[in-house]
Amino acid sequence: MTTFYTVVSWLVILGYWLLIAGVTLRILMKRRAVPSAMAWLLIIYILPLVGIIAYLSFGELHLGKRRAERARAMWPSTAKWLNDLKSCKHIFAEENSSVASSLFKLCERRQGIAGVKGNQLQLLTTSEDVMQALIRDIQLARHNIEMVFYIWQPGGMADQVAESLMAASRRGIHCRLMLDSAGSVAFFRSPWAGMMRNAGIEVVEALKVNLLRVFLRRMDLRQHRKMIMIDNYIAYTGSMNMVDPRFFKQDSGVGQWIDLMARMEGPVATAMGIVYSCDWEIETGKRILPPPPDANIMPFEQESGHTIHTIASGPGFPEDLIHQALLTAAYSAREYLIMTTPYFVPSDDLLHAICTAAQRGVDVSIIMPRKNDSVLVGWASRAFFTELLAAGVKIYQFEGGLLHTKSVLVDGELSLVGTVNLDMRSLWLNFEITLVIDDAGFGGDLAAVQDDYISRSRLLDASLWVKRPLWQRITERLFYFFSPLL
């Protein structure tokens, strides 16, 4: 019996170390950033069992077998659709401004189509303005409405949007609604999901959270897009979830969320429609390719229209493109670069690009909330401040609530607006969307919004920052080490 237990003990020990060695080898064989690999290895060696379970659950990008098969199957028809779209030559821009040229070329070569022109844009800076405009558009819809959100939180004006959507469905408008399972858990636990389905709306719970399948699909891969398409010619996107900030997370101690959305009319709605089509097919298996732009209903104004590229990220989409776009934007800056983000945990490459821009004389400003709803990200963000300040970057800490806007403005002409936070999760993992806009008029509108944010912010004083307590520095460095995993 003693011999039996001895053999079993040695087999357990051998299996334990073989498991650690196997996971270590897998991490080393994967082509990932060195800081990320080192962080995972540290966790595995300090807390082996916890680290191994965490890595198998969250360390690699698993979309799930069924979704991965759908993603592969959809691309032949999607590629044909994109090729057919190229025949609509009147919607594509032939040239761009000097500051936007490199980024638009990158997007065209990675995605296969050029930026689309002739779009009309309107910036909406309050949730009330967004929802009022949306309700009007829903009431005037004639054919179809598609929506996707990370969070839909019942209450306040969000309920008015829901009522208008159900009314549209009852009068014959084809309505589709896709919501992330984790972000919209309150919605799916409320009566609203059933009420909408009873009204004829197709409601899809995207990327369902199922702990029994934790090793088969990465649970923290989320559908983070916020998009609305109406009749294939009106579109919305930006940072706002379908929530009324007067009722959303009021106990978090950060104040109301401050967001920005863009309302668009024009062929950009078609470009966003193909993104939605891909998401819908990956999740449901149903193909809903949008029709090509209709020149009879879309004003392709070459002089006053805005030129836009739509960048989508996530499994099945061009890898690393949003990250490349941000790097290209930073390196294209000649006069000034302004960024707004709620969560700032950049890659080493992006941090280097931002600091280099400041060091070569570009006026670089980053606006982020003073109080953050994520303690982990809040501390990790602070770990980058010293390097940013040393390079000459201005850091503005917004004090008027939780600034949730995600925007970049380069030299007053090149703008990026969408759902992407400047953190690893948005850059490498989630389903995200960003608009790249080449237009000085829109740039002026965005600059006015960013100036308003700055007027409600406090400029971080470098001389005071270096005097912060030692315990804060230690905490910052601790979270900095694990920042590749946040």
UniProtKB/Swiss-Prot annotation:
Q: Name one GO cellular component term.
A: plasma membrane
What does the function comment of this entry state?
Catalyzes the reversible phosphatidyl group transfer from one phosphatidylglycerol molecule to another to form cardiolipin (CL) (diphosphatidylglycerol) and glycerol.
Q: What is its main location?
A: membrane
- Transmembrane ranges? 3-23, 38-58
Instruction: Give the EC number(s) under which this enzyme is classified.
Output: 2.7.8.-
Instruction: Could you list this entry's UniProt keywords, alphabetically sorted.
Output: Cell inner membrane, Cell membrane, Lipid biosynthesis, Lipid metabolism, Membrane, Phospholipid biosynthesis, Phospholipid metabolism, Repeat, Transferase, Transmembrane, Transmembrane helix
Q: Where is the active site?
A: H224, K226, D231, H404, K406, D411
* Name the record gives this protein: Cardiolipin synthase A
Molecular function per GO: cardiolipin synthase activity
Q: Which residues form the PLD phosphodiesterase domain?
A: 219-246, 399-426
Query: Do you know which HAMAP family this protein is assigned to?
Result: Cardiolipin_synth_ClsA
* Catalytic reaction list: 2 a 1,2-diacyl-sn-glycero-3-phospho-(1'-sn-glycerol) = a cardiolipin + glycerol
Query: What InterPro entries does this protein map onto?
Result: Cardiolipin_synthase (IPR022924), CL_synthase_A (IPR030840), CLS_N (IPR027379), PLD-like_dom (IPR025202), PLipase_D/transphosphatidylase (IPR001736)
**Gene name tied to this protein:** clsA
Report the subcellular localization: Cell inner membrane
Q: Name one Pfam family in it.
A: PLDc_N
Species whose genome carries this gene: Enterobacter sp. (strain 638)
Topology in the membrane? Multi-pass membrane protein
Which GO biological process annotations does it have? cardiolipin biosynthetic process
Family note: Belongs to the phospholipase D family. Cardiolipin synthase subfamily. ClsA sub-subfamily.
